[in-house]
Amino acid sequence: MTDTNWKQNLNLPPKDTRPQTEDVLNTKGKSFEDFNLKRELLMGIFEAGFEKPSPIQEESIPMALAGRDILARAKNGTGKTASFIIPCLQLVKPKLNKVQALILVPTRELALQTSQVVRTLGKHVGTQCMVTTGGTSLRDDIVRLHDPVHILVGTPGRVLDLAARKVVDLSECPLFVMDEADKMLSREFKGIIEQILEFFPPNRQALLFSATFPLAVKSFMDKHLTKPYEINLMDELTLKGISQFYAFVEEKQKLHCLNTLFSKLQINQSIIFCNSTNRVELLAKKITELGYSCYYSHAKMPQQARNKVFHEFRQGKVRNLVCSDLLTRGIDIQAVNVVINFDFPKTAETYLHRIGRSGRFGHLGLAINLMSWNDRYSLYKIEQELGTEIKPIPATIDKSLYVAENADAVPRPFRIDELPKGNETVHNKGYQYKGQPVKDENSGSSSQQQQQPPPQQQQQQSTSPPQQQPQQQQQQPNPQHQFAPHPNGQFPPYPQQFHQPGAIPPQQFNGYPPYPQYPPQFAGYPGQPPQLPQGQQQHAQAQNPAQQY
């Protein structure tokens, strides 16, 4: 391949022509070719859809290639991940069969996402990347480390375990990278990070990236970094493309308000945050009962289920995701344009990372906060700390604030064309519009029982030409506060008090994929539990707190 035509043979993705903000456009006019990168690395960068470096990439990549320690601070969704992955891929030597770069991240989902970016950008370089996290088989990680691994991505606990067992050798690893450094240096991880650094050589290079840097980062920098190059692109903390609104809602009316938002907003994909795992599962159940496709994810779920939820949501197989603060950091899903705080966060840091899941890489996004009257103090505190204004929600929200003017401008990977645009739910055989029965392929009949119309209407229907379903959908009126139809064809009752979940979930709620079965202790449900002798009932109730509800 000659020097002139190598770009012509690239498999470039569709160009993203959505409008972008100054967060990623305020650059010095450099290109990736100005960094003297390998041609194989440039091929992976361009084929991944990158056109020009963002401000944080312009500042950090040259200094990282020069061997300097870096302490970089930039907004969420401005390209921090590529800022440290590109130098790693450039400095790694594929012919040297040893770990040459360690990337530490706080969550398992972020580790999976980071490893995927490494493989995407470095697919022509020839480097081998491995991801290791807690909740997975340690034996499998040990077996995989017998093969060549150049870049290791993982969470601190598992990496420390592998290093302490001398399964992975970090004594000659020249690169140490921490993403979300403020979280990594909190009390939860700081001791583990200190132990991991003891396995590194004294002349290793350290790259630290985050959106917020507390005092703990300053003390770590003074101890472990050598004349670090500090980058601070935070002229303001919040992204310029995100519109922020709040609404004071009583607790028992929050679900009704959420249903109204679903019917009014043009949502491509949305993330809904709750403050506890119990409320995450309960809210996902309520949203499913309203007729909307929904998954949920939190830290107490099995790792296999968390991975399945994360990948299917990234692929656009579901429109809404209810989660705890597990997915507040680093998760980059370009199709998400709406973030809803069903429970208002207590700290400015949590709020900043939550709303940063929308408006990725300078695009438009919308953040809506459902607040109780007691949250007004937290609202004032967050506004003061972030230096931003959260406005009261208007009667109608202008679509130009969070939706691209031209729908065709959104690249195919970021479009959810396979999902219905209105109210939908998940059936065993795929997505179906409300009112359309799910056809049974074996019997040829519908799974929903429909009433037969009178003979005169049947004759009129047989003589009239068939109409397409989208035209019928447009002819139906759309009242302002109309509920989403229930999967059984009926409308749900007015939302009741938002209470804690019972021991047994409703049978129509499938939960997160893979859909779990009833717990073993409730194997007899539905029905009555086995009767115990009177002397053992009190002891059994104490052993199973779930039956106290």
From Swiss-Prot:
A Gene Ontology BP annotation from the UniProt entry: cellular response to glucose starvation
Biased composition (Polar residues): 1-11
Keywords recorded for this protein, A-Z: ATP-binding, Cytoplasm, Helicase, Hydrolase, mRNA processing, mRNA transport, Nucleotide-binding, RNA-binding, Translation regulation, Transport
EC number: 3.6.4.13
GO annotations of cellular component type: cytoplasmic side of membrane; cytoplasmic stress granule; P-body
Residue interval(s) of motif Q motif: 30-58
Domain Helicase ATP-binding as annotated: residue spans: 61-231
Keyword presence, Nucleotide-binding: yes
Biased composition (Basic and acidic residues): 414-427
Catalysed reactions, as listed in the record: ATP + H2O = ADP + phosphate + H(+)
Example GO molecular function: RNA helicase activity
Localization in the cell: Cytoplasm, P-body
Region annotation (Disordered) ranges: 1-24, 414-549
Domain Helicase C-terminal stretches: 241-401
A Pfam entry, by short name: DEAD
Family: Belongs to the DEAD box helicase family. DDX6/DHH1 subfamily.
Name of protein: ATP-dependent RNA helicase DHH1
Lineage: Eukaryota, Fungi, Dikarya, Ascomycota, Saccharomycotina
Gene this chain is encoded by: DHH1
